[in-house]
């Protein structure tokens, strides 16, 4: 007697869509994000060191 095939439940493939290529957002590379973060850290450090003398 042959074994019966086990049937798997439906996975729902195709029910959800991810729109990766259809975006209107500003695209920033990972290097750009790191550079902007480092610039922000440097700016805050400079403000911490010299801000009281500059802004009174």
Swiss-Prot record:
Annotated keywords: Cell membrane, Membrane, Protein transport, Translocation, Transmembrane, Transmembrane helix, Transport
Membrane topology, as annotated: Single-pass membrane protein
GO BP, sorted A to Z: protein transport
Residue ranges that the UniProt entry lists as topological domain Cytoplasmic: 1-29
Any Gene Ontology CC annotation: plasma membrane
Extracellular compartment segments: 50-56
Compartments reported by the entry: Cell membrane
UniProt main location, coarse: membrane
Regions crossing the membrane: 30-49
Stated family: Belongs to the SEC61-beta family.
Function of the molecule: Involved in protein export. The function of the beta subunit is unknown, but it may be involved in stabilization of the trimeric complex.
Complex formation: Component of the protein translocase complex. Heterotrimer consisting of alpha (SecY), beta (SecG) and gamma (SecE) subunits. Can form oligomers of the heterotrimer.
Protein name: Preprotein translocase subunit SecG
Organism expressing this protein natively: Thermococcus kodakarensis (strain ATCC BAA-918 / JCM 12380 / KOD1)
Lineage: Archaea, Methanobacteriati, Methanobacteriota, Thermococci, Thermococcales
